[in-house]
Amino acid sequence: MTTDSVTQGVAHSVNGRLPELDFENRPSGAKLGIFDLPKLEVSVAPFTLAHIRVPGGVTTAEDHHEVREIWLVQSGSGILTLDGVRSRVRAGDTLYYESYRRHQLHNDGDSPVEIVSIWWRP
């Protein structure tokens, strides 16, 4: 972790870098790491920032929620199903989901799909 101190579980950034994530294993096999910005000594952000890692051959659980969401696909490619419509997504793509849109990603390759996800309440 790139920090100068950790006090009561709060990381203090030395050089603007956030602490390394602890990824949570999801039932689908995908991994989710959430940057908990409000717990850091930085301005409280009006959004949540996360890193999603989908290993090869894994399909995420279908998701839909009140929050709006943007995905920035960093690496890999796969098949996105958005409200029942399938399309290929790949590194460099930016995706936006309005509230309650059903979305699911299948990694049909061998390399992980890495996604930066940002979500916020409407």
UniProtKB/Swiss-Prot annotation:
Impact after mutating residue 67 to A: No impact on hydrazine bond formation
Industrial and biotechnological uses noted in the record: May facilitate future development of novel N-N forming biocatalysts.
InterPro entries: Cupin_2, GPI/OXD, RmlC-like_jellyroll, RmlC_Cupin_sf
SUPFAM superfamilies, per database record: RmlC-like cupins
Record-linked Gene3D superfamilies: Jelly Rolls
Source organism, top-level taxon: Bacteria
Result for mutant: residue 65 to A: Failure to catalyze hydrazine bond formation. Loss of zinc-binding ability
Cofactor requirement: Zn(2+)
Effect of residue 119 to A: No impact on hydrazine bond formation
Binding site for Zn(2+): 63, 65, 69, 103
Keywords: Metal-binding, Plasmid, Zinc
Function of the protein: Catalyzes hydrazine (N-N) bond formation from an unstable ester intermediate, the product of the ATP-dependent condensation of L-N(6)-OH-lysine and L-glutamine substrates by a methionyl-tRNA synthase-like protein.
Designated name of the protein: Cupin 2 conserved barrel domain-containing protein
Annotated organism of origin: Rhodococcus jostii (strain RHA1)
